[in-house]
Amino acid sequence: MKSEKEDQGVSGPVQVSFGDQYMPYHGAWLRAFDSLGWPQTEDPIKGAGVGPFVTPGAIDPATRTRSHAAAAYLTADVTKRTNLRIMTGARVDKIAFDGSDAGPATARSIKFTKDGQKYTVSASREVILAAGTTQTPQLLELSGIGNASLLRSHGIQPLVDLAGVGENLQDHGIVSFGYEVADGMPSGDMARDPAVAAAAMSAYQKDGSGPLGMVPLVSAFMPCVDFPGDKREHLLQTIDSSLDDPKLPVTYRKQYSILRGMLKDSNEPTAQYILAPFQLLPRAGPNAKDIFGMSHPGNFISIVSLLSHPLSRGSVHVSSADPAAAPTIDSGILRHPADVELQARHSIWMEKITETEAMAQLLKPGGQRLHAPDKVAELEKAQDLCKELVLSMYHVSGTCAMMPREDGGVVDPRLKVYGTSNVRVVDASLFPLVPRGNIQATVFAVAEKAADIIKEDLARS
């Protein structure tokens, strides 16, 4: 495993570590990729585009606890600030703007509901929206900012006609293949046994050790390996057909041109593979509790693939003018035919990973396969299987993108919502394109940069 503290960084508030122990799958994963001609060259944090790596986690190595945003930034000194009040269990209903028709709209207050009681709090300077990719656009639309015709259809009076709000939704859809492990091999599925679960919890509560204190995942960023030149050219032609469609929004036209170039770059991955040492059951869904419920008898690992640069796009919009109503979410995953083919080809290659000597010796000979009873090798079958099994990776992004307004953008380079003077967005909804991997670090980086921008603008005012 190649990783240096200097590359990861050690001075920030968010803690990152690899846990205190490893499973047999960690080393086998690296050896498997090496045997397939893809050794680890360097830590991806340094910019390595392709190859396997052991996945770090946002785990504090001293306490073995999650280093989440509140733990990292909401320290005791911060919570004592007199200009900070945190209210939980409240639902923001809308942003109220002044009634002037001249110039950009200015937010004057926030209306919210808590325990059935409605409240209004004044906004003397700015309103910062950090409600996430699905609810930031919902709040803008509830406040009259969005596609004017859509707002009117729900009885909302348009204030700023901004068609990009809620559009451009992107996500990394994952397809999971499950393999039964050899007798004696560890698996998270063993936690079904109350005694095993109790022992794991006891070890963790004692000193942070045991399986609950580890970072169990290993990953790889990879190009599409078994992809003959003529087939690759056909895939590019599929994208070109999209670009030739006169109805394609200018937003997607520019994005597809960029993504097409990435597909041709041998140093740029088209998918990420992840090994998770437990079973995933997409057919048991749609609830996450059922998908991760480990209800299938036996002990398994899952290998998943997710497209690094999907072309498929979805949307999220209000379902009514009622703030309590959930928005309508269209994930759009695997909507573009090029995504379907790429996902299928990467899924087929997951079977090849398990056939390497390093991985095969950890799996039960003739063991159960959760995704399909037989090896998946044909493209058409793989495409159908991907459509059946695909799940969200919960990396939703892009619904209030930082792009030019004429290209479907919602926020400017200073994070301000077009048509407003004092409303900013600080979350993953402002990504024009979803990053190729997990979005957590990028969200933290955006928030850090946003803090700098806000302070700079306040200093000028």
Show the residue positions of the predicted features.
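Conserved redox-cofactor binding core of oxidoreductases
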Residues: 1-94, 98, 106-107, 177-180, ...
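Structural detector for helix-capping/boundary residues
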Residues: 72, 90, 125-126, 400, ...
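Short loop/edge segments at beta-strand edges and connector loops
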Residues: 88-90, 160-162, 404
